[in-house]
Amino acid sequence: MQNNQTKSSWTTKMLVEGALAIALSFVLARFTLFKMPQGGEITPGQMIPLIIFSLRYGAKKGFLIGAVYGILDMMFGGYIIHPIQAILDYPLPYGLIGLSGLFSDEFKRTRSFAPVLKGTFIAIIARYITHVLSGVVFFSSYAPEGQNALVYSIVYNASYLAVEYAIALVILFLLKNFITKDLLDL
């Protein structure tokens, strides 16, 4: 009997792991450590389950799981002023966390931690860019009088995403042995 599954097909195991990643991220996001006044928050590692899923299954599947998470996050506490802003602040940036799986083939081949760090860095920068764009286009009125909207959005979004990234890195380093030795064997 021939296996008709392609590399892009979803198995039951992938779907279950994707649902678990979404659920864990959702729960972690509810334990907000700090909430910014105009949106954005610092959490105890809400991106980690999405990153781990992306490492296991690649950027495309990671993007989809992240986007679904973003939609749920938007539905349960999102702040929406325009449909484009909703996309820029919810499904797109969390979908872009899936870019942490860009180097999943290298990670699987080498079991090195470097692809994890490279992918996570690219993912957080991509997420940051979408939030900055949203800030410039839709939240520029919050900038102090006389301040450039782009500069305001860059600083505002960096103030919480840099901390989110640092927390993610600390957790990834704490999980380094598990990630490089056991993650692929599950």
Identify the residue ranges that each predicted region occupies.
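Short helix-perturbing small/polar motifs within transmembrane alpha-helices
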Residues: Q2-S8, K13-V27, I65, Q85-V136
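Juxtamembrane/transmembrane-helix interface segments of polytopic membrane transporters
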Residues: S25, A29, H131, G135-A143, ...
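Interfacial aromatic-anchored transmembrane helix boundaries in multi-pass membrane proteins
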Residues: L28-I42, V68-F103, F139-S141
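Alpha-helical transmembrane segments and their cytosolic interface
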Residues: M1-I22, L150-L186
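Alpha-helical transmembrane segments of multipass membrane proteins
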Residues: L24-A29, D73, L96, A126-H131, ...
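Residues that define the loop-to-transmembrane-helix transition and helix capping
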Residues: K60, A114-L117, V151
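Hydrophobic transmembrane alpha-helices
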Residues: M1-R56, K60-K61
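Structural signal for the C-terminal ends of transmembrane alpha-helices
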Residues: L55-Y57, L99-K108, L174-K181
